[in-house]
């Protein structure tokens, strides 16, 4: 069984009289540990698919399973819990709090986790042990992204 499974997923956006189909009957599976790249032209629905998988939007039709949990049937409150505890999402523009250190940014995020790991240990694990007390402006883009992850 796939870790992530999308079956016949459809997403439409309605704006007044106009309906735009952003995702039209897509089906694919991703196994646990598999590395996947989603590519396509502008407007193909890549961001919409990721927003649905990340629990930030819902599909209009179809079934989405993540680790056996059918997120396509989740209500708003359940999606919030899913986003908070079950999935990680790092945006292209990850907004770290600029007046907090790398360590403080991770400690802040850990406050909403069920079983957070020690922030200092996590940062050391991703190669930022010497940068704990640096502010985002003092970190490279890649280092900032590791803090966000």
For each feature predicted by the language model, list its residue ranges.
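ABC family nucleotide-binding domain
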Residues: 2-149
């Amino acid at each position: 069984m796939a870790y992530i499974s999308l079956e016949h997923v459809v997403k439409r956006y309605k704006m007044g009289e106009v309906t735009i189909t952003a995702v039209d009957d897509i089906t694919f599976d991703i196994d646990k540990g598999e590395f996947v790249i989603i590519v396509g032209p502008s407007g193909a629905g890549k961001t919409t698919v990721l927003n649905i998988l990340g629990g930030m939007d819902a599909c209009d039709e179809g079934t989405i399973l993540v680790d056996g949990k059918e997120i396509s049937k989740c209500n708003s409150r359940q999606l919030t819990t899913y986003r908070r505890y079950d999935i990680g999402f790092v945006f292209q523009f990850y907004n770290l709090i600029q007046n907090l250190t790398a360590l403080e940014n991770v400690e802040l995020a850990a406050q909403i986790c069920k079983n957070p790991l020690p922030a200092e240990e996590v940062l050391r694990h991703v190669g930022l042990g010497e940068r704990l007390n640096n502010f985002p402006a003092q970190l490279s883009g890649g280092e900032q992204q590791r803090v966000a992850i």
